[in-house]
């Protein structure tokens, strides 16, 4: 029993230090920092890349929003990768004004493969672009997106994540859960880290990469979370990613639990894959470079599945001590509340606070706020499942919200 006590106490200290660190960093999200100075003044040329698999219902609106950018038309091109499509995605995208590349490879369906296939061709062509932007086909892009990313390039940034807002935040408790989660992460993880000189992470869509950065390697990713993988590879190489709150892209979220479950299972397996491939390189980078940014990247990996395992061990240890008559019922309840409050209750207050300071419309979201702990709690079951079953194939998330930028604005 003494060993259980010692293990439990060590894990308590470990998790306490971890969360104190996270809380300290997150406070930087409340401080307004000055914009970085410009290191050059140039109108950069972009290519917007849209991987799309059977997205005929939504891709036209995305292309339209890109064509309506408040940016000189001769300085950007729109490419749609019609990836294993069996519908009219290619026709609709071309009619909307995009340049369409058709790809057929049933064995390699993920966005990472499509990006690598497309960028390899552009690298071989020595295409005349300064940077590329990546969007999901269901997105709608704010008209100032390219202007903001051009400014970021002029500030010397090479990889920048834009602000992924939500097209359908109040449609269901599931889409609301995504909205609460992303809004909170945007401010208290990504912006906070950017403010203190650490690295935010790419977020799947609405990001910019300087073209020169991939000319030697291509888009070389192999996990189910190509965005996180690419981010970690940059951090290992000592490159800090940028953040652009005012480069806004609206993304459609699942509205049904089954679709959300499948998507988040894929993300969790992707994180496990990233942990497998990049935990040691990150640890080596911490040892060699001795930078807080590398250490923070390592903590991100450790803070996902490993920290979940630690939390589960801590929670279950309470039952072990209780069953051996070394803890009262009251003590068991108190210790379980110490786990439940930060896991299920704190997210409600953090979501409400984030909406308030970011000027989000709170009233339409109030009907779903009580369900947010259920959304976050379901991640516990997802993590447990994915620890034991990781042979998850990529499955398409259906996008049906045909909304244009005028309807959102």
PLM region spans:
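Cell-envelope/extracellular polymer assembly enzymes that use nucleotide-activated donors
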Residues: 44-47, 77, 229
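Short, acidic, metal-binding catalytic loop of nucleotide-sugar glycosyltransferases
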Residues: 64-75
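Acidic helix N-cap motif at the loop->helix transition within catalytic regions
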Residues: 60, 87-94, 102, 144
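Juxtamembrane C-terminal module of membrane proteins
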Residues: 24-44, 280-293, 297, 321-409
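Long helical/loop segments within the catalytic core of UDP-sugar-dependent glycosyltransferases
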Residues: 104-125, 143-223, 265, 272-276, ...
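Short beta-strand-to-loop acidic/aromatic patch adjacent to the donor-nucleotide binding site
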Residues: 126-140
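A conserved acidic beta->alpha catalytic loop
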Residues: 82-90, 105-107, 140
């Amino acid at each position: 029993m003494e060993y259980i006590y010692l293990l439990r106490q060590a894990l308590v200290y470990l998790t306490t230090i971890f969360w104190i660190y996270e809380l300290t960093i997150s406070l930087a999200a409340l401080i307004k920092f000055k914009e970085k100075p410009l290191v050059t003044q140039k109108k950069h040329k972009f290519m917007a890349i849209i991987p799309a698999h059977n997205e005929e219902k939504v891709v036209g609106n995305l292309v339209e929003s890109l064509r309506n950018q408040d940016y000189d038309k001769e300085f950007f091109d729109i490419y749609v990768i019609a990836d294993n499509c069996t519908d009219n995605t290619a026709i609709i995208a071309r009619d909307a004004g995009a340049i369409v590349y058709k790809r057929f490879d049933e064995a390699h369906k993920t966005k990472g493969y499509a990006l690598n296939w497309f960028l390899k061709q552009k690298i071989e062509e020595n295409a005349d672009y300064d940077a590329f932007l990546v969007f999901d086909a269901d997105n709608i892009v704010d008209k100032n997106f390219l202007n903001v990313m051009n400014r970021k390039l002029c500030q010397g940034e090479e990889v920048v994540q834009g602000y992924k807002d939500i097209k359908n935040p109040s449609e269901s408790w599931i889409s609301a859960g995504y909205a609460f989660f992303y809004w909170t992460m945007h401010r208290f993880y990504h912006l906070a880290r950017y403010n203190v000189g650490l690295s935010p992470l790419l977020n799947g869509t609405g990001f910019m990469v300087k073209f020169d950065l991939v000319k030697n390697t291509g888009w070389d990713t192999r996990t189910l979370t190509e965005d996180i993988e690419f981010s970690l590879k940059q951090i290992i190489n000592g490159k800090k990613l940028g953040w652009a709150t005012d480069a806004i892209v609206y993304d459609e979220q699942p509205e049904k639990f089954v679709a959300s479950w499948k998507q988040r299972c894929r993300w969790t397996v992707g994180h496990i894959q990233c942990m497998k491939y990049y935990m040691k390189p990150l640890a080596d980078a911490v040892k060699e470079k001795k930078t807080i940014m590398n250490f923070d990247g390592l903590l991100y990996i450790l803070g996902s599945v490993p920290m979940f395992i630690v939390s589960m061990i801590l929670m279950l240890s309470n039952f072990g001590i209780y069953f051996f008559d070394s803890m009262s019922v009251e003590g068991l309840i108190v210790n379980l509340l110490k786990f439940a409050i930060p896991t299920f209750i704190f997210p409600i207050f953090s979501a409400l606070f984030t909406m308030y300071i970011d000027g989000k419309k709170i009233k339409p979201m109030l009907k779903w706020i009580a369900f947010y702990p259920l959304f976050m709690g379901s991640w516990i079951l997802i993590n447990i499942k994915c620890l034991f079953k990781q042979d998850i194939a990529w499955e398409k998330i259906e996008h049906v919200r045909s909304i244009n930028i005028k309807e959102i604005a």
